């Protein structure tokens, strides 16, 4: 992570809060988070090896660059028990259609634990 979040995570945990962090996965994550989401970015979808077993979910934004081969590569990198979530880019119709096609094709090929979820902050227009 680019920001130094360890002091914040420690302070929140001391006060009894649970901590969820979403990261692109290119750097290690602070110790003590309760839920880690990894959202790797194209074109390489690089993820630090130490995060692979810690991630509770993996999110892929369905961009124009996202391919079925990339979905397969990311799915193979993480444990089957870790959900891989396809998220359409905002409310863009092309991205929703592409996300659905990727989900259906992944299902046809028997790739496990792949889901579809909207980016709620985009739907609600929260910046």
Enumerate the language-model features and the residues they cover:
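Conserved AdoMet/S-adenosylmethionine-binding subsite of the radical SAM
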Residues: 1-127
């Amino acid at each position: 992570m680019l920001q130094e979040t360890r002091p914040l995570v420690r302070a929140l945990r001391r006060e009894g809060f649970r901590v969820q962090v979403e990261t692109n996965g290119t750097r290690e994550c602070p110790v003590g988070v309760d839920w880690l989401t990894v959202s790797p970015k194209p074109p390489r979808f690089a993820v630090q090896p130490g995060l692979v077993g810690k991630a509770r979910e993996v999110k892929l934004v369905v961009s124009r660059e996202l391919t079925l081969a990339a979905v397969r590569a990311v799915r193979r990198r993480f444990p089957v028990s870790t959900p891989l979530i396809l998220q359409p880019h905002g409310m863009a119709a092309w991205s929703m259609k592409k996300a659905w096609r990727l989900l259906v094709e992944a299902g046809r090929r028997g790739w496990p634990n792949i889901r579809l979820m909207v980016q709620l902050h985009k739907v609600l227009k929260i910046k």
